[in-house]
């Protein structure tokens, strides 16, 4: 595999700003590893962060890389982020899904249109855009051509980037970590249904 992805899957009706918070925490973990991350909207309710891998990386190694990053985020920010697969156990937390890297799993590709009520497009972002604040509804089939003309193919650097150092993540995961806390979030009603992001 040439890249891996971390899928941020929020419960229904959670403000998208909270998804952006988790994306920033993923970026922090990647920065510790000197690994580049490329965010994009899913075109629906979630966000994907892609990380280039060395050419020929086995699926198992890519999956382990994402599992370590996702677990670090969930451990440091347990009030908002989780790697819990059970929807009932997640509550109002955002699922940091690394299992989409299992062979045969699929994600909406960059620039793909989605069948939803706002005609969303899965759109690559810069980190500056993410930091400034965006929503999935900002990127639709109606304004996609205009955006491409303005910013070009933001996904091109992913295809050219040097792959992440897989040895670095193994060392990082073994080192002692300081657990953080997330302020201002509370678990409320349990999400009752699953949805594709």
Placement of each model-derived feature along the sequence:
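Active-site palm subdomain of RNA-directed nucleic acid polymerases
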Residues: 27-41
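Catalytic palm subdomain of template-directed nucleic-acid polymerases
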Residues: 50-62
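Short, conserved phosphate-binding/catalytic loop or strand-edge motifs used
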Residues: 41-51
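Active-site glycine- and acidic-residue-rich loops that bind
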Residues: 20
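C-terminal accessory nucleic-acid interaction domains of nucleic acid-metabolism proteins
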Residues: 1-5, 9-16, 25, 32-33, ...
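Nucleic-acid 5′ end/cap handling module spanning
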Residues: 17, 40, 53-55
């Amino acid at each position: 595999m040439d890249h891996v992805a971390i899928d941020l899957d929020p419960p229904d009706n959670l403000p998208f700003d909270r998804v952006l918070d988790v994306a920033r925490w993923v970026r922090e973990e990647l920065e510790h590893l000197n690994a580049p991350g490329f965010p994009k909207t899913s075109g629906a309710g979630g966000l994907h962060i892609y990380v280039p891998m060395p050419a020929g990386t086995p699926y198992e190694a890519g999956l382990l890389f994402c599992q370590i990053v996702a677990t670090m985020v969930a451990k440091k920010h347990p009030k908002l982020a989780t790697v819990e697969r059970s929807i009932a156990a997640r509550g109002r937390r955002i699922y940091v899904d690394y299992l989409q890297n299992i062979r045969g799993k699929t994600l909406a590709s960059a620039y793909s249109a989605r069948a939803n009520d706002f005609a969303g497009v899965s759109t690559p972002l810069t980190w500056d855009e993410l930091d400034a604040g965006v929503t999935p509804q900002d990127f639709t089939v109606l304004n996609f051509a205009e955006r491409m003309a303005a910013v070009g193919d933001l996904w091109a650097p992913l295809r050219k980037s040097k792959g992440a150092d897989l040895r670095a993540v193994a060392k990082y995961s073994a080192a002692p970590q300081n657990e953080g806390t997330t302020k201002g979030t509370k678990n409320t009603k349990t999400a009752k249904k699953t949805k594709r992001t």
